[in-house]
Amino acid sequence: MAIHRHCDGLVRRDFLQLGLRGALGLGMCDLLRLQASAAAAPAGGAAKPVNCIMIWLDGGPSHFETFDPKPDAPDDIRGTFKTVPTSVPGVHFSEPVSKLAGIFDRFTVVRSICHKDPNHGGGNHYMMTGAPTPVPVGCGAFVTFHPSMGSMVSHERGVRSGLPPYMAMPANTRSGGPNFLGGEHSPFIVGGHPNSDGFRVHDVVLPGDLATGRASSRRELRGALDRMKRAHDRVVEDPAVEFDRFYEQGFDLVSSARAQEAFDLGREDAAVRERYGRNDMGQRMLLARRLVEVGVSWVTVNWGGWDHHGGIEAAYKGEMLQTL
């Protein structure tokens, strides 16, 4: 049977025997170690503060049915819906995004971005990284020839407030990886269903039946066992010696009131949760906001299902546009 090691030397079986891995956020350990390695040689120059939420509408919503209806174009080009005035005089949006039209004075629509790649794989890469693919790729390709924007922000900012600088939910985008920047700048994935009553973030939030006091007792037990192992590790120069520091960081993360509050959507006012939409995507938007408020530099909310080749009118009258 293969032995899978974590954090430079600790065997997975050791985690299970101590009953710690699922309870104390130890899935973060590798990421914390890698980020610390990267921080040992920071890039020159002072980093500018960046907190960004990228809402990635995978597949691409139609511009004609959202922000650029082209009401004066021929019938076979212009959008199928009526137009509505925005809060900026002279600018109109399509009817399905009428709520966004009312606050257009608070955001900007950039209509000059374009690329010449005819499929989703290459287009996704261009938008996520700012660079075209060096070779043609297929429509469904999951490739990253260059670091994604989130990974670049992670590289420049590093860990803030004990939380990873780059997160994605509920999964990474196809070109959202770090490439040559290294695995330490991959996103921490926040999966699950945040609209459910029992939602918690795997490897970060303590289970409801595990109080911090009990976790502390297990931490002390682990410390006693590791003191015996550490002497041997130092003799053989086992990298697992470094595990202690990252274990402590993982424990601090799950025991931090600030981190727990950010992930606990139950602390949010019920009326606010309703405004975001009581569905998984609406609650992911809310969680993203809470994460950047506590210091996460970049959060990507990956929202699929926007590749409408037909039935667009029915789709845009449904929940997707209401949530957006």
Regions found by a protein language model. Give the residues of each.
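Ligand-binding pockets and gating/stacking loops
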Residues: 1-324
